[in-house]
C-alpha cells in the first residue's frame, strides 16, 4: 500500500519510507545512479557488439529505469542496453503512473512502459523497447533468489532499496556479498546510503569504495568498483551441472546461418538481425511453408499442478509473446480474444485450481471459473460451457504471416536450398547447399529445422543423432462459421481447440498421432474432429458441409516435451568427460566445465507450442550466442540445455 506525501511523493506503508526524494526525485536519480556510475562518459565507448548491462536492486516506481532510458536517448551511438531489476513488492500501473507524473519530461517513456507493464508473473518478466535497443528484465521476488538466477554480468549496479534501517533484509551481508557473482572487473555501483554495515559488506565482497557528495540534504553517497578479477571456475561439482556453465563467445559474432525458416528460425533471424547480425536463412521450401503454415495457432500457458520447468517456461513465453505481438503484429495476424480451457480427464478442477494458486497468478493471467460464474452468465454461449480456467489474454496468430514479417527485416537473406554438409574453417562454419552453388560462410550455425535437426546435425558426429526429436502427426480443419458459432467470443479448449470466427472461418484442431507419418489429410481425422465439436458444443451446429479445408503437419517433439535451446557439445567428448559423474563416490569430486563446440547451436523441439515458445526462445538463444544476460532464470536455461539428453544417456 502507498501513501502520498504532499500528494506527490510516494511512501511505502510497509516500510514507512519514501520511494524518492521529495526535493526532486528525478534529479536525485541522475545524481546518485546515473552520475554515480559515470554512465554518460562510459557510454560513449559502447558499440553494438558490446551491450551495457545495469543491475538494479529495487525497481520501485521505475524512476531509475525511466531516467536511464532518457539518458540513453541522448547517445548518438545506440548500443543495446540491458536493465535487470529486482522488486519484491511491485506497484500497480496506476501507482507508477501517479508517482512518475511529477516529472513531465518522462511522460512519453512512462506511457510506453505502462503499455507493456501487464500480465506480470513471479520471477523474470522480459520486455523490449525501442525496437530491441533497450531490454528490461524485471524479477518479481526476493533479491536473494534473483541473484542466484541472473546469468549475465553487470557493468553498473544501482543499489536502491529502502533505507537499511527500514528494510535490512535487502542490505544483508549475504545479499551484498552475492553481487560479486554478477560483477566483472570494473563493474561500478552507487547507492544513496553510506551506512557502515553496507560499506563493510561491499568491501568484503571485493568492491573498492568512494564517498561522494550526496543529493540535496544528504551529505554523502557511496560509489565504488569491483576490483577483483573473477576467477574463471574450470571445474564444478556434479550437482552444479558443469556442462551448463555459461561461457562468452570465443570471438565476436557478426554473421549467423539459420537452417530452417519455420516460426523458430524466423523469430531467431529477427532477434539476431535486431542485434546487428547478418543472417543467412536456409530453407528449401521458403518461409513457414511446412507445419508453421497452419491457418491459425492458439496460445496460452500450460499449467502444471506444481511449478516446474514446463509451466514456468510457458508462462514467461506467453507474457513475452503477448507483449511482442501486441506491438509487432498486424490486425489480421494476431487476436487477443481470451482462451477458455474446460475440464478434461487430465486437467480436473482440483488440478486447475491448485495450478493457479501454486503459481501465484493474477486474473490477468488465469482465473478459475466455476459453473454459474459471471463469465458463464454474461455471455449467452458461455452459459453452455462447463467450469474451467479463463486465460484472459489467450490469443490466436497466423504463424506463416508472422514468420514472413519477422524475416522481412534488413540484414536477413533467405536462401531457398537444402543444407548438405558443414565444415569448420578457422573460426567460421562453411555450409554447402544442394540446389545451389552458393557457399555460405558464417560465424555460427543454428539448427532450427524441426524434426530433421537430429538427422542433419548427425553428419557432424559420424552419423550419431544426439537430439531425440520425434515426428508427431497432427491434422486440423477449417470450418465455415454458422449463425450461432459467429458469436463465440473466446478460444475454446478441452481435448481439442476451436478458434473464434475470423473472417467467417474457425479453425478446429488438432489430432495427435505419433505412429502415422502420412502427410495427407485423412477422412477419419476430419470425422473425429467434427464429432468432437458436435458433441462438445452442439448449439454451434457444425456439420460436414461446414468443412472448408484440411491440413496436416508434423510437430517436433522431445521425450520430455520441452524445447531444446542452446549450444552443442561433441557427444564423444561429453561421454568421456562425464561418464562417471553420477557414481556415488564422485559426489564431491569436481569435473571440468566442458567447452561447447564454438558457433554451433540448436533451437527446436517446440512440439505443439511453437508460436508460444518461439519469441522468447529466440531471445534466449540470441543472448547465449552473443554473451548477453539471458531473459529467463538460470535454472530454466539448465532445463532447456541441449546436453540434458547426453547426460541422460550417461545415467542409463
Swiss-Prot record:
Record-linked InterPro entries: FAD-dep_OxRdtase, FAD/NAD-bd_sf, MnmC-like_methylTransf, SAM-dependent_MTases_sf, tRNA_MAMT_biosynth_bifunc_MnmC, tRNA_MNMC2, tRNA_S-uridine_synth_MnmC_C
Domain of life: Bacteria
Cofactors, names only: FAD
Primary location recorded for the protein, binned into one broad class: cytoplasm
Compartment(s) where it occurs, according to its Swiss-Prot or TrEMBL record: Cytoplasm
Record region (tRNA (mnm(5)s(2)U34)-methyltransferase): 1-227
Biological processes annotated in GO: methylation; tRNA wobble base modification
Annotated Pfam families: DAO, Methyltransf_30
CC per GO annotation: cytoplasm
Catalyzed chemical reaction(s): 5-aminomethyl-2-thiouridine(34) in tRNA + S-adenosyl-L-methionine = 5-methylaminomethyl-2-thiouridine(34) in tRNA + S-adenosyl-L-homocysteine + H(+)
HAMAP family: MnmC
Function per UniProt: Catalyzes the last two steps in the biosynthesis of 5-methylaminomethyl-2-thiouridine (mnm(5)s(2)U) at the wobble position (U34) in tRNA. Catalyzes the FAD-dependent demodification of cmnm(5)s(2)U34 to nm(5)s(2)U34, followed by the transfer of a methyl group from S-adenosyl-L-methionine to nm(5)s(2)U34, to form mnm(5)s(2)U34.
Name the UniProt record assigns to this protein: tRNA 5-methylaminomethyl-2-thiouridine biosynthesis bifunctional protein MnmC
Source species of the chain: Leptospira borgpetersenii serovar Hardjo-bovis (strain JB197)
